[in-house]
């Protein structure tokens, strides 16, 4: 394991890795650690009480964070005709069909989110090996395959984040930047937790949200007392 910097060592000494911190204190600690020369992301890891190996317990979805992500998002949309015009009007940077597919095949992936109208999947479907590994393949489960491309574009621009449980049963997501006010980070975290609760598989038994931990890009994890999340 790589040695921690003196800054991280000093911060780590303040954090009890076994303690559950009230959300206010957890956010304060995480923001205190985010002292790098750039505006660090504030990330969350949620351990779910599911069996990720079972297909009926895969947790996946999306949520629009009320305070946004602090990131400028470039959106590409596969659409034609009226839907293409709607996508452009909603703010999509790139809109196309076969021409856009050719750009993707050529390696021109200068976008962060890909949205597709259902009638374009015959074209988009051929791009799975390129878009899939990068987490860019449109999927109806996260709202990126939809006839309402305009709303999907607006959601992406407004701070929508996608989530999917990994093989260890953990959800990883970014809920903002270190420059955000604690109230903004808290509202974003609450929105994510609510979305995860709605996405709970019917076959999941026992405690569903097992652990929640916050960290900054260059920081260490701080565990959150879930009982303090709902309280305002």
UniProtKB/Swiss-Prot annotation:
Gene3D superfamilies: 3.30.190.20, 3.40.50.790. GO terms for biological process: regulation of translation; translation. The keyword RNA-binding applies. Pfam families: Ribosomal_L1. GO terms for molecular function: rRNA binding; structural constituent of ribosome; tRNA binding. PROSITE patterns: RIBOSOMAL_L1 (PS01199). InterPro entries: Ribosom_uL1_bac-type (IPR005878), Ribosomal_uL1 (IPR002143), Ribosomal_uL1-like (IPR023674), Ribosomal_uL1/biogenesis (IPR028364), Ribosomal_uL1_3-a/b-sand (IPR016095), Ribosomal_uL1_CS (IPR023673). Keywords: Repressor, Ribonucleoprotein, Ribosomal protein, RNA-binding, rRNA-binding, Translation regulation, tRNA-binding. The keyword Ribonucleoprotein applies. GO terms for cellular component: cytosolic large ribosomal subunit. Transmembrane segments: none annotated. Part of the 50S ribosomal subunit. Binds directly to 23S rRNA. The L1 stalk is quite mobile in the ribosome, and is involved in E site tRNA release. Belongs to the universal ribosomal protein uL1 family. This is Large ribosomal subunit protein uL1. The lineage of its organism: Bacteria, Pseudomonadati, Pseudomonadota, Betaproteobacteria, Burkholderiales.
């Amino acid at each position: 394991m790589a040695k921690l910097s003196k800054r991280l060592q000093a911060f780590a000494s303040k954090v009890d890795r076994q303690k559950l911190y009230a959300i206010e204190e957890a956010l304060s600690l995480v923001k205190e650690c985010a002292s790098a020369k750039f505006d660090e992301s504030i990330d969350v890891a949620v351990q779910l009480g599911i069996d990720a190996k079972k297909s009926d317990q895969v947790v996946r979805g999306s949520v629009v964070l009320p305070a946004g992500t602090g990131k400028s998002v470039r959106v590409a949309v596969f659409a034609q005709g009226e839907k293409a015009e709607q996508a452009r009007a909603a703010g999509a940077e790139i809109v196309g069909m076969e021409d856009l597919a050719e750009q993707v095949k050529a390696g021109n992936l200068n976008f962060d989110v890909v949205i597709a109208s259902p009638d374009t999947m015959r074209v988009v479907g051929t791009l799975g090996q390129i878009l899939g590994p990068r987490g860019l393949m449109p999927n109806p489960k996260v709202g990126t395959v939809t006839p309402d491309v305009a709303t999907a574009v607006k959601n992406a621009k407004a701070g929508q984040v996608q989530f999917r449980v990994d093989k260890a049963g953990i959800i990883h997501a970014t809920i903002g930047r270190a420059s955000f006010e604690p109230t903004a980070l808290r509202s974003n975290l609450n929105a994510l937790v609510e979305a995860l609760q709605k996405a709970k598989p019917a076959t999941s038994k026992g405690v569903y949200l097992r652990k929640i931990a916050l960290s900054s890009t260059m920081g260490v994890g701080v565990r959150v007392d879930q009982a303090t999340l709902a309280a305002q």
